[in-house]
Amino acid sequence: MNGGILTTNGKTFKKAVTKTAILLAISLHLLSFNFIQLRAFMSGLDQNTPRPIDIRLHQASKLLEIKFDNHTECMLSCEFLRVHSPSAEVRGHGAGQETLQIDKENVNISAIEPIGNYAVKLVFTDGHDTGLYSWDYLYYCGQHYEAMWQDYIAKLEMAGHKRIDQT
């Protein structure tokens, strides 16, 4: 390469190099843009989603208390978080591959591990530890707790299972 002009066997390929360089630059830009979009989606880094400022586990009552930076709070039961785990084990790898979680009334959280600055990994007493709970997913769960819980109860009943209330 000499001043942006490629020569091979005495021939100059300035136009080819320029077109190739432009196409390569555009391809790299699109690849970079798509990767950034995918990474933001996968990691739960929606900039508009409130972030937790305090996460407390109340083991006796089996509740996870989360306070967000927009002054909202939520209390999510360990059972709720377990049956709504964002893991592939629970959600599957595509639509229709979900696995209904049953007999999780007594589950508790044994550990909370931070994952970067975008999520936590919850370790449950039944051994489940593959779900990464992003900030936007936790916020979504807090905002839609009742609807998600009722949907879960309906799915249990449709599958012929009964939840044993532990109150």
Which residues fall in each region the model found?
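Motif-centric detector for short Cys/His coordination patterns
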Residues: 33, 38-167
